[in-house]
Amino acid sequence: MGKLTTHILDLTCGKPAANVKIGLKRLGESIMKEVYTNNDGRVDVPLLAGEELMSGEYVMEFHAGDYFASKNMNAADQPFLTIVTVRFQLADPDAHYHIPLLLSPFGYQVYRGS
């Protein structure tokens, strides 16, 4: 059974990013799900699993600006990024897809994890 998971790390403090809003949709469709990360920077259940996970292109929207704004940063350090959009393709509905996001107020890195 395939699944889609994610994990967000805050590079400014080297800790998981809790309470980050994530939107997920299939390309060309409206938002399928909106979830928030837990204290470990993960979502409590897979974003997609089983029959929900179908081949195709998807978009995840990580609401980075809201997250960093909640950290009471100095005005000069207000985040440059508001929403990090990641567009990706799921080819095998039986595979486990994990998309980690390494995040700072001014940049990010995303990759297919394991």
Curated annotation (Swiss-Prot):
Changing Y111F: Reduced activity. Pathway: Purine metabolism; urate degradation; (S)-allantoin from urate: step 2/3. Changing R42K: No effect on activity. Induction: Expression is very low in excess nitrogen (glutamate plus ammonia) and is induced by TnrA during limiting-nitrogen conditions (glutamate). Expression is further induced when allantoin or uric acid are added during limiting-nitrogen conditions. Its EC number is 3.5.2.17. Pfam families: Transthyretin. Keywords: Hydrolase, Purine metabolism. Substrate binds at H7, R42, Y111. GO terms for molecular function: hydroxyisourate hydrolase activity; identical protein binding. It is an enzyme of class 3 (hydrolase). It catalyses: 5-hydroxyisourate + H2O = 5-hydroxy-2-oxo-4-ureido-2,5-dihydro-1H-imidazole-5-carboxylate + H(+). GO terms for biological process: purine nucleobase metabolic process; urate catabolic process. CDD domains: Transthyretin_like. Changing H98N: Reduced activity. Catalyzes the hydrolysis of 5-hydroxyisourate (HIU) to 2-oxo-4-hydroxy-4-carboxy-5-ureidoimidazoline (OHCU). Belongs to the transthyretin family. 5-hydroxyisourate hydrolase subfamily. HIU hydrolysis also occurs spontaneously, but more slowly. Homotetramer. This is 5-hydroxyisourate hydrolase. It comes from Bacillus subtilis (strain 168). The gene is pucM.
